Amino acid sequence: MGQLDSGNAAWILTSASLVFLMTPGVAFFYGGMVRAKAVLNMMIMEAAALSVTMVIWVLWGWSIAYAGTSVGGVFGDPATGFLLKDSMVSDGGVFTSASLNSNNYPVSVDVAFQSAFAMITVALICGAIAERVKYSTWMIFVALWITFDYAPLAHMVWNGGLLSADGAISQAIGAAAHDFAGGTVVHINAAVAALVIVLIIGKRKGFGTQPFRPHNVPFVMLGAFLLWFGWFGFNAGSAFAANGTAGYAWVSTSAATAAAMLSWGFTEKIRTGHYTAMGAASGIVAGLVAITPAADVVSPLWAIVIGAIAGVLTCLACGLKFKLGYDDSLDVVGVHGVGGFTGTVLIGFFGEGTGLFAGGDWKQLVVQLLVALIAIIWSAVVTGIIAFALEKTIGWRVTEAQEVGGIDLADQGERAYDFAGTASSVLKEVK
């Protein structure tokens, strides 16, 4: 065991906290986008993503993803790290980390950091199924999805598994697959899962005929800014050390995000005649998503290019749901699916020393495409099985009357804005 690097430990713990903050950021981002009658339901679904995921992570999620002996390069043995028994030890009655990792910070810090990634990934999904899903079904889905979808895919990509830089796919192509912070594991995975559930549960009542406008755009903007801030932990923290790569990932992340916000705005201006706050917020998230897999391997110029391309493509993609007839309520597929795929594939063009336009050849592009495709198939199949089973047993949706009346009142028994109650209290005081 090496000597503890307290600087690395402090940075990764800070990054874990920043990534944790992203899920409350998503709660505001999505909460502002839904109608007023569904904001509490959306926010409590985000709370469930945090809570259920953390319990599963401690029980067996960490072991499946990172601790257990690899089974075919697909998942780790869930027993090895069950209840974190491989990661924590008691020292005189006080628990501490069992060991240091290769960057000389405690494994317990890794457990914290990676748990926050699992939380934000499943939290992204609920935006697609807003305003119509039972909270109880969502909680069960989170537990099953983290266990059978997220943890194995994280193992495959980030723990030396099938889709990793050292995995069988990379060896077969002769190029190392690269996903710095989650283009496949987080964004493609969440977006495909969201699409599959949407296709199984169907559209909201009134989709395509009624305007579903965001009820609180300032909430959306606040959420976008919190996400931008939290993403510094997401990307720069994925250097797993307080070093120059972390610093550069911070810079490339902001450069791509800024470019995406601007390019989304220009695209929106051409199409609608306006630069909207909703567009700015969505462009910010699109840029953050697209640079995630590539933040450490693209030059400043290519980071800006990736952001600009992603801003345009995601803006255009968000309108496809109306043409194709699927109700992705808050554009999870358009932003995270298209953005994540764009960033993952563009490494094959712009990755330093390996991309077609950056001193490399076609092999990097092939391996990036192949890994993205396998991630899509994995997410679609696993999510499809889970979502279909839930649909045929306990069911996903609230009743039509509950949906029309407002899922907040039906499922939570609360209103976000009790104007009638406030007015009544004021009148009583006046009298």
PLM features per residue range, with description:
Residues 1-431:
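Glycine- and aromatic-enriched membrane alpha-helices
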